[in-house]
C-alpha cells in the first residue's frame, strides 16, 4: 500500500469515525461509510488540505464516490504536479 493510500485511509477513518478495516478501496462514502453529502464535501476539502492540492473542481469531485476513487485522483494529480516541477 502506498504512503498516499495509507494517509487517505487514516484521514477517512478519522473524519467519518469508522474503523480503518471498513475503509477499503471499494467502500462507497455514502453507501458503506455513512457519509452524507456535507461529510463528503468536507472530506474532499480535508484531502485537498492534507495533500496541498488546488481545489478539486466540482465536476471532478462529484465523481469521487469511493475510497479508491479518492486515492486514484490524489495519486494522479500528485504525479502531474511532480512532472511539472
From Swiss-Prot:
Top-level taxon: Bacteria
Q: Which organism is it from?
A: Azobacteroides pseudotrichonymphae genomovar. CFP2
Write down what this protein is called. Acyl carrier protein
List the Pfam families: PP-binding (PF00550)
Query: Where, per UniProt, does this protein localize?
Result: Cytoplasm
Which protein family is it in? Belongs to the acyl carrier protein (ACP) family.
Q: Which UniProt keywords apply?
A: Cytoplasm, Fatty acid biosynthesis, Fatty acid metabolism, Lipid biosynthesis, Lipid metabolism, Phosphopantetheine, Phosphoprotein
| Stored InterPro entries | ACP, ACP-like_sf, PP-bd_ACP
Q: Which residues carry this modification: O-(pantetheine 4'-phosphoryl)serine?
A: 37
- PROSITE patterns noted in UniProt: CARRIER (PS50075)
Chain's role: Carrier of the growing fatty acid chain in fatty acid biosynthesis.
**PTM notes:** 4'-phosphopantetheine is transferred from CoA to a specific serine of apo-ACP by AcpS. This modification is essential for activity because fatty acids are bound in thioester linkage to the sulfhydryl of the prosthetic group.
Amino acid at each position: 500500500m502506498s504512503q498516499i493510500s495509507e494517509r487517505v485511509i487514516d484521514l477517512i477513518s478519522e473524519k467519518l469515525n469508522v474503523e480503518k478495516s471498513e475503509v477499503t478501496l471499494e467502500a462507497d462514502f455514502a453507501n458503506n461509510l455513512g457519509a452524507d453529502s456535507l461529510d463528503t464535501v468536507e472530506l474532499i476539502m480535508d484531502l485537498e488540505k492534507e495533500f496541498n492540492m488546488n481545489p478539486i473542481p466540482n465536476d471532478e469531485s462529484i465523481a469521487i464516490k469511493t475510497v479508491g476513487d479518492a486515492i486514484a485522483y490524489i495519486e494522479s494529480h500528485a504525479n502531474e504536479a511532480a512532472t511539472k516541477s
